[in-house]
Amino acid sequence: MIVLKGASALSPFRLARFESRLQTTVPELHIVGAWHCYLIQIKSGHTLDMSALHRILQAESVSEPPQEHVVSRYVMPRLGTHSPWSSKTTELLHGAGQPIARIERGTRIDLLGWSANAATCPAIAKQLYDPMTQSLLESEDEVKTLFNVPEPLSLERIALIDLEHANTRWGLALTADEIDYLRTRYTELNRVPSDVELMMFAQANSEHCRHKIFNATWTINDKEQQHSLFQMIKHTHQHTPQYTLSAYADNAAVIEGHPTARYRPDPITGEYRHEAVLPGAFQIKVETHNHPTAIAPFPGASTGAGGEIRDEGATGRGGKPKAGLSGFSVSHLRIPTLPHPWETPRALNPRMASALDIMLEGPLGSAAFNNEFGRPNLLGYFRSFELSASKTLTRAYDKPIMLAGGLGAIDRIHIKKLRLQPGDVIIVLGGPAMLIGLGGGAASSVTSGTSTEALDFASVQRDNPEMQRRCQEVIDHCVALGTNNPIRSFHDVGAGGLSNAIPELLHDSEVGGVIDLAKIPSDDPSLSPLELWCNESQERYVLGISAAHLQAFAAICTRERCPFAAVGVATATEQLIVGYGVTLPAALHVTEQQTPQRANHTETSPTPNTLPPSVREAFAIDLPMDVLFGKAPKMHRNTAHPPPPHWPTLDSTQLDLHHAGLRVLAHPTVAAKNFLVTIGDRSIGGLTAREQMIGPWQLPLADCAITLAGFGTYAGEAFAIGERAPLALLNSAAAARMAVGEAITNLCAAPVESLSMVKLSANWMAAAEHPGEDALLYDAVKAIGIELCPALDISIPVGKDSLSMQSRWQADGATHTCISPVSLVISAFTPVADARRQLTPLLHHQTNSELWLIALDGGKQRLGGSVLAQVHADSAALPTFGGECPDLDTPETLRAFFALMNDARNAGLLLAYHDRSDGGAFAALCEMAFASHLGLDITCDNRTEHLFPHLFNEELGAIVQVADEHRTAFTDLVEQHGLTAYTQRIAHPTTAPSIRIMHNDQCLAQWTWETLFDAWWSVTHAMQRLRDNPECADEEREIARTFTAPGLKPTLSFDPAVDVAMPFIATGIRPTVAILREQGINGHIEMALCFERAGFHCVDIHMNDLITGRVHLDEFVGLAACGGFSYGDVLGAGRGWATSILERTALRDQFAAFFTRTDRFALGVCNGCQMLSQLKSMIPGAEHWPRFVRNRSEQFEARTALLEVIQSPSIFLSGMAGSRLPVAVAHGEGYAMFDTPADQAAAHVALRYINGHGQAATHYPLNPNGSPNGITGLTTTDGRITILMPHPERTPRTINLSWSPNEWGEDTPWLRLFRNARAWVG
């Protein structure tokens, strides 16, 4: 056991912030320092190369004792767990030849002024560590106990009389009917259940997994109901089955897309190729991960995103996740530095993360998983809502909604799973088993706070997106084999772990299975059979393949370094047998490298009947499949509607318009969402056509997201979110209709072809066990399932429910309860024929125009439940939330609106579009003004007493910009669609930096543009200051609030229409480029495409191909090192990848030889840039290059930034000097750190960030990583090798940029970079 001391764990500003938090409780406490400490376990019988280990970890062996009066505390991963960092770093060190069994990293904190008071203070402990994921240890000796392995628990048998006790002990959440069912079945079997069987049954039959409430029969108000909830949802598909290829049958729904050609490597040769144009299809799925996010926000949200991504990948026989969405509903934020009068104090549940902590950590978790996996997150929503119903009852989201969804691509031949046959091999693909997420399916199905804290911890999960990336590469390879795809069927591993996934896999094919527990990969030898079978370790899939394909499948996994194990076989008898004593066919034998834990094999194909009773008695599981899936009791719910709500009504005549406008814009639901958007990569994959950010000033105001179906088409997919949950406190049916309506009005920003092509995912949340809430849920489902969606010809082929949305705890001698409203989040998806015809809220500057409001309420202007009401709910009395509830009164109105928008778009009448939602027309208009850096004169033609309802009602509708010259054509079209009474002019843009409310030429209220912007930006600014570098937050606010800021201002020094590579392409010669990737790299496809378009022949090269000698760099004229997260960037971005080269002599020599050849070139982008910078010692002319370290903001930065091409020797940038170009930026470690000032002066800089005036960008976020003089790209003395942090390969077409000048053609000027390389080769 070795303990090493590493570098400082906290930057100066984080250290100061940390100390300040501690001193609020113990003022005399000071932090002397905080350092990484590494705990390393050596493999038995081996010795470490300590000098290499010090070099790789940048650590030292000496761990000096603390100074006098200084106390050290160690914050380590929670005892008994393995951190994601450990898994990734262990693999990295194995690749570098280090014989370690395990490594963990913690933080040593040295404290001055520690006292007995501090040692026993819960507030201090809370600041030092998170008990859900960490342990606080007092000495190095205690630290060394981290790797202690306890004895595994034995298999338990549970007497039937003790089932109730077991139900409570393990938090199984079984109903009384289910316990009776189990007693009956086990009595029939003449035996008692094992603990493994009970846990498996509980997870497989939890509300989370089996949706018992949605499948229940109902009696409401003593009246039998005709339909179950699920039947009403399915009714929409029965009414409108068109364009849906798979519904309710798989991990995700599949809908028709436009024809497209896939671009991917040939699975045999690795050569990139354009495949034939085939009918398109894409899968859609939206999940929630509410309970884990409430307990541990970062890992909860991260694994929520990861689980949904796996659902897309595991659809049919293999899909490819393409783009994501996310969302959060929480209670009041209560930001300490931004108090709001409506955020009144109350007791909070001590067992759950606060709303503030959830929104500081949860979005980072969701974004981190998407970023590292390599999926752009293009859409989201955020709601903060809380109402006090009494002193002990709150309607809010203490148990949050954490939404994770998205869409993916799937080949039509792979939509339907194949049936497993007896003898087919059961595969576990992905990471090892650990004691993670045990019982999560059941835990998420009960009221938060009613289980024990130990069970809360047991359901906490951990993430490793880099592992999931490897799994996806295996899936992609299998899918690319087309009809030879070895995957017959598979499922992702989620709630319930293998105990749910493997039985589901077998049950789908009506087969049984024999599983050897010894074959399940595990990183924890102490796991009991229950823990091994039921844990929810993430990034795993279960697959069924033919035994004949096993060796070929193993080869794919080996190349991708993706762990897998053949754990069992399917059997004709529908019996599930799981244990350590089973025998499996010799055909399942694969090499030691793939299956480290092998049992003895025989040629006998196992069946339950051939196994002797004495052996079967020892099995953890020996059950007929129908015990799990057959005849469990069906729920019946007998309920009644609660009394009608009596929330006081807001008297808007008593409000001050000026202050009301500022309050509404400052509400977190309305306010700017930049702090949630820029942390997520939105350009990875190269298929983004509309992300959140719009315009030259890059504000996240897009109404929908759009992706492209392929690299050579403008057809694609659009998706949008609708959510109006607080209205359910007034009328749950109306809230559901409004959610659907809002999803449609958001989606209308895209060129939607037909309402019947729109498919919805419905995510339902409710506190179903609170009296009457289930009846309100029934009303909501009926409102859209039976009534609205069929009337619109829209179907709901996929969805999810989470029906334990309440928490309960004791405080001040009373029981407190927090219950969410009945909440529906609608995600709408549709194919689009031409993504270029999208509209955004960006107003056109050069056109005389007016803004028109199409208000679908027909003038009712209902204010019930509005943000205006919420921000004035600060009196001691009951909150003024009531009044008439907004609603979609007639589906025909929404149909007419949809048709109007399509016809107006087709006629070229619309310049801009923005839907009306939270904050009403006032907020929507302000957002359009903010996005466009324009002022507005807002007109109110009705009586002044109706001013507040006119401006702040949140009925369905949209605002469009129409040029004056098209006014008549637009109003004629409005009349044709019968919407004249719903349409009015509401504003016109001005160049003045002000927003005015005008009535009969009288100014009723006026704000400066910056005053309103400051209110709108306040939440983002406050959250960034708490979460990121506060200096960066201040700098961004100052730039964003400047009305005269120039924004993105591109200029070109060359004609991009001139293709310098064309003469060489015409020769028919295509030089070969290695598209190089390491495990965790995710940007290789778009990189290959850009080189291919420039005239190169591209080949997919994994580092394993070079290590094994399958290929050699001599075979390639060029090398492109791609972006991503090699080894999860655990030791610094790109360092793991570089280490895998530097620590292998033969590989190091091969790269050195390639770099030395003057007829070879190399390009490193992002992670490839970081990796090549670490190899500068072997690259001629690169000796002055910097290292790339953490961004100054200490946050992942995803931006569209403005670059200037500097005159340099770079062959890639020849003829481009002086150009100023927008480009996608997405990295966490892009700060260029030079060894000396002389190196910075001598380095050949090729690219730098600039501001809109053409000057080197020194302020954030124009310089997103803080590099000196904006440096972000460098080259060698001869220019053959260039490295850059931004991503030109993601934006070869103007459709890929979030904004570009109107005069640019189909391609962006960045294609010149790749064409220059082809011209250089000649």
Swiss-Prot record:
Residues 593-608 have a biased composition (Polar residues). It is found in: Cytoplasm. ATP binds at G300, A301, S302, T303, G304, A305, G306, G307, E308, I309, R310, D311, A702, S917. Its EC number is 6.3.5.3. One of its GO terms (molecular function) is ATP binding. It catalyses: N(2)-formyl-N(1)-(5-phospho-beta-D-ribosyl)glycinamide + L-glutamine + ATP + H2O = 2-formamido-N(1)-(5-O-phospho-beta-D-ribosyl)acetamidine + L-glutamate + ADP + phosphate + H(+). GO terms for cellular component: cytoplasm. The keyword Translocase does not apply. Mg(2+) binds at D703, E742, N746, D915. Residues 593-613 are annotated as: Disordered. Its main location: cytoplasm. Pathway: Purine metabolism; IMP biosynthesis via de novo pathway; 5-amino-1-(5-phospho-D-ribosyl)imidazole from N(2)-formyl-N(1)-(5-phospho-D-ribosyl)glycinamide: step 1/2. Residues 1073-1322 form the Glutamine amidotransferase type-1 domain. PROSITE patterns: GATASE_TYPE_1 (PS51273). The active site is at C1166 (nucleophile), H1287, E1289. One of its GO terms (biological process) is 'de novo' IMP biosynthetic process. The keyword Nucleotide-binding applies. Keywords: ATP-binding, Cytoplasm, Glutamine amidotransferase, Ligase, Magnesium, Metal-binding, Nucleotide-binding, Purine biosynthesis. NCBIfam families: FGAM_synt, PRK05297.1. Phosphoribosylformylglycinamidine synthase involved in the purines biosynthetic pathway. Catalyzes the ATP-dependent conversion of formylglycinamide ribonucleotide (FGAR) and glutamine to yield formylglycinamidine ribonucleotide (FGAM) and glutamate. In the N-terminal section; belongs to the FGAMS family. Monomer. This is Phosphoribosylformylglycinamidine synthase. It comes from Xylella fastidiosa (strain 9a5c). The gene is purL.
